[in-house]
Amino acid sequence: MDLQLDSESYWNRSSRAAFSFDDEDEVDLAPDLVSNGILADDTISEASFNNSVALNLSIKSILSEEALKLVLQEQALDDRVLPKGVSPEEELKLLRRQLQSTLYSPNLEATAQKLLQGKTAPLEMFKSLHEKQQLLDTLMAQGGGHAVITVLLFLKRTLNTTQFHGILRERPKALEQYLSYLKESGDLAGHIELLQLFGRHQEAALKQFQAALASGDTSTRKKHLQLLVDAYATAGVGVIPLYEQVFHAALKMQQLMEKDSALGKLLRDQPTPVEVLYACCQVNSNWKEQDMLKPVSPQRFAADQQISPAQYEWTALNERAQAQAYADLECIFERVPSWHPLKTKQFHISFDLTLAVLRLYELQAPSTVLQLFLSKMGNSVEKLALAQRVKCIKAVIDAMAGLKQQQELQQLKDTLPERSEEQFYCENALKSLQSKRWTTDNIKLKL
C-alpha cells in the first residue's frame, strides 16, 4: 500500500486527481449556480437546502410586489440594517418576519421607540381605538415630546371629533402638549376653540385679547376689540370683572386714538396706556381745571384706563417738567377734600415726595420749583438733608430755620455771595428767628 501511495502513476489517475490551488486551475462554479437558478432567478427558500433542485424558487412566488415594497420600506426605516454577507436564506427569514409584523400585528414598543428617536414609523397598522390609545399612553409614559404630537395628529386625522376630544379630556398632559403645539404652529383659532371647548374661558379670552391687540392698525384693533367685548357680553359664559374692565379700557383707548388724529401723531404703533396718557398731557392746554367730560383730558383718560393716581401724577410731572411748563406742576397735585367740597384746594401727592424732588432735580428744574416741593415736607431734618443734596439754598435756609439752627444759618450767610438773593433770604430768616426768640423770652418774663 505504501508503494502505491509513493508511485507517481497512482496520483496521476483521473479518479485520484488532486485539487489544484493555482489560479490557472481554478474551478468555475458560477455556471452550476446559474443553471440551478440560485443567482439567476433570486431563488431562495426556507426549504431544505440539502437538495439543489429544491432551490428553483423565486421570491416573487412567495411575496407580491406590493407586499415586497412594504417590507423594503419598513426595512429602510428600521435601525436593524441587514449585515453584509448574510446568506439568502437568512435574508428571506428576516424579510418575512418584518412583513408579518408590518401587515398583521402592530409592534407597539418598536413603533414607540422609533417615534421617540425622531424617526418615521407607519402608524396605519394601529386600527382600533384601543390600539391607538395604547400607543399614545406608551409614549406619554416615556416622556413623549414631539412623538406625542405625531400620534395626536394621527389620532385627529383617523378618529371622529368626539373620540379625539375624549382622549384629550382623559389625558390632561396630552391636552397641554397639543395646546402648546397649536400655539407654536400659529393656529390661534384652533387654540382658542379648544380652550373654550374644555371650559377654560378666561384663558381663551386673554388669547383673543392678545390677538386683537396684535392687529395691524388702529381701526382693525378697534373692530376686533369691539367683537370681543360683544361676544362675552352675550355668550353666557362671562369672564372675571378685571378682564372685562381691561377689554373695555382697551376699546376706549383705540376709539380715542382713531378719533383724535393729533394724538395719534404723537404715538408710536401699538402704544401702552401710559404712553397715551403722556401724549394726553402733551396736548392738554388747561391744567387748572380737571375736565372729566373731554375724553382726551389726562384726568379723564386716567380714569377710563383705571391708571392709579401715583402713575398719573408721575407721568404728568415728567411731561410738564420736560416741557418746562413748571407753572402747571402745582395744579397736578392739587386736590379738593371730598369731605369738604367748599374748602380750598390742598397739595396732595400719591407717591414719595422725595422721588418727585429728585426727579425734578434730574430734569434740571429751577430752584424755585424745587423749593416749592421741598416746602411740602413736614420733617425738617429730612428736608434739610434733601435740600442740601439737590443744592437748593432757600430750602436749606427754611429747614435750618425750622430746626432753629441760628449758628448754622449765620455760617451759611457768610458763605453766600454778597448782596445776593440767597443772602438776603438768609438774613430775613435769621431776623425772624431772633424775633421769635425775643418774643418767647418776653412771655417767659411776664409769667
Curated annotation (Swiss-Prot):
Among InterPro entries, the record links this protein to: Spe-39, Vps16_C
Coarsely, its chief localization is membrane
Q: How does it sit in the membrane?
A: Peripheral membrane protein
Where would you find this protein in the cell?
Answer: Late endosome membrane; Lysosome membrane; Early endosome; Cytoplasmic vesicle, Clathrin-coated vesicle
Gene Ontology CC: one annotated term: autophagosome
Q: Which Pfam families match?
A: Vps16_C (PF04840)
Q: Name one GO biological process term.
A: regulation of SNARE complex assembly
Q: Which domain of life is it from?
A: Eukaryota
Record keywords: Cytoplasmic vesicle, Endosome, Immunity, Innate immunity, Lysosome, Membrane, Phagocytosis
**Upon deletion of the gene, what happens?**
Viable and fertile, with no obvious morphological defects. Strongly susceptible to bacterial infection, displaying reduced survival after infection with E.coli and E.faecalis. The initial phagocytic uptake of bacteria by the hemocytes is not affected, however bacterial clearance by the phagosomes is severely reduced. Phagosomes fail to fuse with late endosomes/lysosomes, preventing the phagosomes from acquiring their characteristics and maturing into fully acidified phagolysosomes. No effect on endocytic trafficking and starvation-induced autophagy.
**Family as reported in the entry's similarity comment:** Belongs to the VPS16 family.
**Entry function:** Essential for phagosome maturation and the innate immune response to bacteria. During phagosome maturation it is required for the fusion of late endosomes/lysosomes and phagosomes. Not required for autophagic flux.
Protein name listed in UniProt: Vacuolar protein sorting-associated protein 16B
